[in-house]
Amino acid sequence: KLSRGHSPLMKKVFDVYLCFLQKHQSEMALKNVFTALRSLIYKFPSTFYEGRADMCASLCYEVLKCCNSKLSSIRTEASQLLYFLMRNNFDYTGKKSFVRTHLQVIISLSQLIADVVGIGGTRFQQSLSIINNCANSDRLIKHTSFSSDVKDLTKRIRTVLMATAQMKEHENDPEMLVDLQYSLAKSYASTPELRKTWLDSMARIHVKNGDLSEAAMCYVHVTALVAEYLTRKEADLALQREPPVFPYSHTSCQRKSRGGMFRQGCTAFRVITPNIDEEASMMEDVGMQDVHFNEDVLMELLEQCADGLWKAERLRAGLLTSINSSSPSMKSGGTLETTHLYDTLHRPYSKVTEVITRAAGSWDLLPGGLFGQGFFEDEDGKEYIYKEPKLTPLSEISQRLLKLYSDKFGSENVKMIQDSGKVNPKDLDSKFAYIQVTHVTPFFDEKELQERKTEFERCHNIRRFMFEMPFTQTGKRQGGVEEQCKRRTILTAIHCFPYVKKRIPVMYQHHTDLNPIEVAIDEMSKKVAELHQLCSSAEVDMIKLQLKLQGSVSVQVNAGPLAYARAFLDDTNTKRYPDNKVKLLKEVFRQFVEACGQALAVNERLIKEDQLEYQEEMKANYREIRKELSDIIVPRICPGEDKRATKFPAHLQRHQRDTNKHSGSRVDQFILSCVTLPHEPHVGTCFVMCKLRTTFRANHWFCQAQEEAMGNGREKEPGL
């Protein structure tokens, strides 16, 4: 009794029972063995539900194997025995849970997948149904959580079996393969060792494909998982040392033990990613002796975590401080260990400044959808945000997805939708799979812009994205500036980027329509923001500055600003539009003239003698466009007369405020280059959206207008 049923004699008796299950027996003999095991479990429950879990684990493994027997009678007996093990465990804990049995069933299943051919087939599924039926028909536990807990366990088992079978089918589809492994890792949330195994496997796939940010996030989740496990293990030890006077409450004990070596658990990593809260869902088993996870393992994982973040260029001082504070060796005073850890962290710390200026250049997001129930099945109509590494062009992403699904379904059955507009599935031919792709940008509201002051913060932990589509009230896509409207779509993903996966489903979306004068305000605000951002950079990119200037003041390409001014600010037209919008557009134009003047001054300071003539030409063009705008806008525009800052829309304020400390490093530079400067090869980020649908329909969002602009390098016409 003192050893909780784990005496040498009990071990020998149990091994005899287990031997009957391990060796081939007659049907009648096995039925008697199941009856005897049921009696053993009933008489000695502490053997299976307290202390070491090895006997419970061995029994679960053999009984699960019998659940796959060719004989229906054996499958029924095995299913009923497994149900009895769960039910008895539930009663033993005072009708609270059967965590011990739950955990050992999941662990045994993972071993069976590797050891037993055909596990998970029809026979095994029938056994799972028998277990569910037993739970549903058991009246004694009708008003408890037991029945739902049993359903949850069988659902997890089915998820593991289905994902394992599908992995071979999708071994050439990295996104789907990672999704399947993620579903396994999620199903093993109650089993730290197995969850770590699948997260490590996901990290290897990401490294192989060059998705270093996602690999780093896998390392972060693994490290947080181990930290959380050690926190709870410490709480269990504290409970054993000082048994509580009141009824047992693991949560209260855990709170008391937070002052120990592992006082924070996974919450210490929340500064790196809010997605880390997933690791807090770990189920607890006081008797589980997992000797693999200890302080040394955590130290190794912390080093791996820092190295992974450094390689992904996603380090900053705050992240390293979090890793530092999570390290028990920093607190325990071990000189050699502390010296080694500081040496490991020195390299990332020394690179933090450089990394912050380049981190934004590692993004490429693709939100999207697939159309075609007959091909994509459960994926039909789903929208995803994809994150692609660094300078991946939109055309390359589209071609990769087209080839991927062409290989799966046949090239004659897959089509790309060359349009970013909304697709009605009823208009699609059910014989084909359709893919639709479009480019998106990060979206921040005013509060987020105030909180995300650094460039790093604006390309890390991003959850909302935006794309725009031009339209007119007459139904045409393009029209004159006085009739050109724009629909802005804001997408919210389920998780923040970067994540352990490179594609994340879209949770919901919000649409906002901009009328013609609002489009003018939006487009002109972008021009002002671009010029301000370039002029305020620590290292001004003179080539980009001159290109932006030329696109703003040169006579041959100034149709955009002048067209907006004539359409909305001319005395004969202003009465058609709301006074507040007209006033705002006038203010934006004043800022535009001021920004052009500032950009000319910066350019004049940087140029050499061979560009003096070019500078004088741009100054002359600037004076000309300023004069024309002054003739249109009342009161007249005079440079320097109004220093008030324009109140830009929230999504544009980031352009106004951001500072480019390194050429081509900002996320929104690439976004804007898709509109006005598509030919810049050094810019580093892109966001896109992909939508799939199958009836043999795959819906892929694809900005044809942007691709055309990238092909000819010209600035877009007004309202495009």
From Swiss-Prot:
<dbReference type="InterPro" id="IPR046770">
    <property type="entry name" value="DOCKER_Lobe_B"/>
</dbReference>
<dbReference type="GO" id="GO:0016020">
    <property type="term" value="C:membrane"/>
</dbReference>
<dbReference type="InterPro" id="IPR046773">
    <property type="entry name" value="DOCKER_Lobe_C"/>
</dbReference>
<dbReference type="Pfam" id="PF20422">
    <property type="entry name" value="DHR-2_Lobe_B"/>
</dbReference>
<dbReference type="GO" id="GO:0005085">
    <property type="term" value="F:guanyl-nucleotide exchange factor activity"/>
</dbReference>
<feature type="region of interest" description="Interaction with CDC42">
    <location>
        <begin position="277"/>
        <end position="638"/>
    </location>
</feature>
<dbReference type="GO" id="GO:0012505">
    <property type="term" value="C:endomembrane system"/>
</dbReference>
<keyword id="KW-0472">Membrane</keyword>
<dbReference type="GO" id="GO:0031267">
    <property type="term" value="F:small GTPase binding"/>
</dbReference>
<dbReference type="Pfam" id="PF06920">
    <property type="entry name" value="DHR-2_Lobe_A"/>
</dbReference>
<keyword id="KW-0344">Guanine-nucleotide releasing factor</keyword>
<dbReference type="GO" id="GO:0043547">
    <property type="term" value="P:positive regulation of GTPase activity"/>
</dbReference>
<dbReference type="GO" id="GO:0007264">
    <property type="term" value="P:small GTPase-mediated signal transduction"/>
</dbReference>
<dbReference type="InterPro" id="IPR027357">
    <property type="entry name" value="DOCKER_dom"/>
</dbReference>
<dbReference type="InterPro" id="IPR043161">
    <property type="entry name" value="DOCK_C_lobe_A"/>
</dbReference>
<dbReference type="Pfam" id="PF20421">
    <property type="entry name" value="DHR-2_Lobe_C"/>
</dbReference>
<dbReference type="InterPro" id="IPR043162">
    <property type="entry name" value="DOCK_C_lobe_C"/>
</dbReference>
<protein>
    <recommendedName>
        <fullName>Dedicator of cytokinesis protein 9</fullName>
    </recommendedName>
</protein>
<dbReference type="InterPro" id="IPR026791">
    <property type="entry name" value="DOCK"/>
</dbReference>
<feature type="domain" description="DOCKER">
    <location>
        <begin position="186"/>
        <end position="638"/>
    </location>
</feature>
<comment type="similarity">
    <text>Belongs to the DOCK family.</text>
</comment>
<comment type="function">
    <text>Guanine nucleotide-exchange factor (GEF) that activates CDC42 by exchanging bound GDP for free GTP. Overexpression induces filopodia formation.</text>
</comment>
<dbReference type="InterPro" id="IPR046769">
    <property type="entry name" value="DOCKER_Lobe_A"/>
</dbReference>
<comment type="subunit">
    <text>Homodimer. Interacts preferentially with nucleotide-depleted CDC42.</text>
</comment>
